Amino acid sequence: MHVTREPASFHGGKVTTLEASPAGVVLNATGSAIPLLTFRNFSLRCDKSDPKVSFQTPWNWDVIQGKKIAVITSNSYLRYQLIVGLAGLVPPVSGNFFGDCVISWPVAGEGGLDGRLRISHGLDFLSTVYNDCIEQSKVSLDEFWELLSGMEIYPNLIIKELSGSQKDFFFLALSVLFAFDFYLIPKTKYLMSKAAKPLRMLLLRQLEDKSLISTSTNNRFLREFCTDGLVLGSQGEILFSGGLSESLEWADRNLEQSKTSESDENLFEVDLKLTNLDASSDVNDDF
């Protein structure tokens, strides 16, 4: 997804570690750095059962290049909505986000590929759409194909005919191959598995000067991949922002039920209502 910067009078602030207000809320401060992504009056749906419940206070802040942000919240539906919202799969309830960057599809997701395509045809399609991201990639096609062959995944195979473990490996490898400016990482159970270790190393290489937002609840992943934390209340209110360790500690002390299970990642495997409108049909969430 390519997000193009548009003219705006908004001069939001970058999210940094700041002094807390008397209520314990970390405030935003203005910054001179050029933002990679700007949220302006941005609000998402927060309650699966009630489409009228959205952000208590709309977001007006920037993500600065190089920030790797772990979103920490006890609201699993909000985590889900944030990823699909930034991926462009659902519209925000209000406001928008913009920036001069290319946002990934959710890492380890299917990238919109039809399962009837052959592996080579799927790669050709995405390489055409994300041509710049292939040209700037720190992962070579030779590395990509070599890793796939180790899992007996070959160019002429049809995607839907891969085994479950082959699909997991293929879709993660595909996400790692492209050099996006901004990565969305919701699921990390497979990424942090032994089988995915070679891909994990390549993703770290690809992310060296990039930005990401992750809604993972895997602390090992967060400590390995993220630099900053953003603690959210159940209605999207920013309760705390700062370094990853202090954000995790703050959430453990103050956020009710902040220690969540990776079973939350199943939200990305089943049919959920992706829309923020009340009267629309379900969409199959295969990314």
PLM regions: where:
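A short, flexible loop at the N-terminus of ABC-type nucleotide-binding domains that lies
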Residues: 2-6, 10-62, 70
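ABC-family P-loop ATPase nucleotide-binding domains
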Residues: 45-49, 101-197, 201-203
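Conserved catalytic segment of ABC-fold P-loop ATPases
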Residues: 224-232
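ABC ATPase nucleotide-binding domain signature region
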Residues: 38, 65-131
